[in-house]
């Protein structure tokens, strides 16, 4: 569990590692990884190991929206379609 100080430091970064985004959002590591694999979360790959780095503001905003839609009972397929349609407009 991250400390309050660690979360404050994470909130200041422009890009977050997968584990940091999970901590900040209060979701499981596997959730972030799965949503990334589905193309729901934006990220850049960097370094020799091609680690994923998430733009903090955009990724947290998108994740909140995904979680809200999931609470409303939307399937991941419906959420993917929603974002595709929204991107097209």
State the predicted function of each range.
Residues 1-23, 37, 42-48, 53-89:
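Arg/Lys-rich, alpha-helical DNA-contact motif
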Residues 28-31:
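Short coil turns linking two alpha-helices in DNA-binding domains
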């Amino acid at each position: 569990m991250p400390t309050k100080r660690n979360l404050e430091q994470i909130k200041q970064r422009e890009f977050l590692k997968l584990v940091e985004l999970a901590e900040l959002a209060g979701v499981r590591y596997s959730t972030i990884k799965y949503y990334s694999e589905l193309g729901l979360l934006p990220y850049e790959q960097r370094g020799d190991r091609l680690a994923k780095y998430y733009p903090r503001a955009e990724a947290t905003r998108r994740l909140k929206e995904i979680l809200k839609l999931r609470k409303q009972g939307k399937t991941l397929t419906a959420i993917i379609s929603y974002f595709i349609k929204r991107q097209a407009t």
